Amino acid sequence: MQSAYIVGAKRSIVSPINGPLSSLKINELAAPVINNLIETSGIKFDDVDELVVSNALGAGGNPARSIALASKLPERVAGLSIDRQCVGGLDAILLGIKLVQAGSANVVVAGGVESFSNRPIRLAQEYDKILVPYDA
């Protein structure tokens, strides 16, 4: 089994719901943090094999891929998204460690991102029937 090491850690500032960061989407929040992490850790952007990101309140799609494309990571870097409530960022880090230990990747960037100001609004199914009536 290959050894895995954590070589750096960063986070964005904390902002309240609808506060100063409320206009930023998750890729706009995460990309600068990832860029700074890589620039200060001694690794190169081209060395990164995988980006693993947890996002529990996503609107769908693949947030990790969107974040990878918004950052300075090479376009070839895959984005793996985890939809997990509570400790999802830690799970992303643990999955990154397992990818390295298994020899599937050499360098993984991993963590979590949320924007409660931009979370999707989900309606119960009965509201769908009111908002979009079905005409038979």
What are these regions (language model features)?
Residues 1-2, 16-45, 61-62, 68-136:
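Acyl-thioester C-C bond-transforming condensing/cleaving domain
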Residues 47-54, 109:
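Short glycine-rich phosphate-binding loop at a beta-alpha junction
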Residues 9-14:
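Short polar catalytic/cofactor-binding loops
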Residues 7-8, 83:
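Residue-level detector of conserved, well-ordered beta-strand and adjacent loop positions
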Residues 7, 48, 89:
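Residue-level signature of catalytic and energy-coupling elements of molecular machines
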Residues 55-60:
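Glycine-rich phosphate-binding loops at beta-strand->alpha-helix junctions
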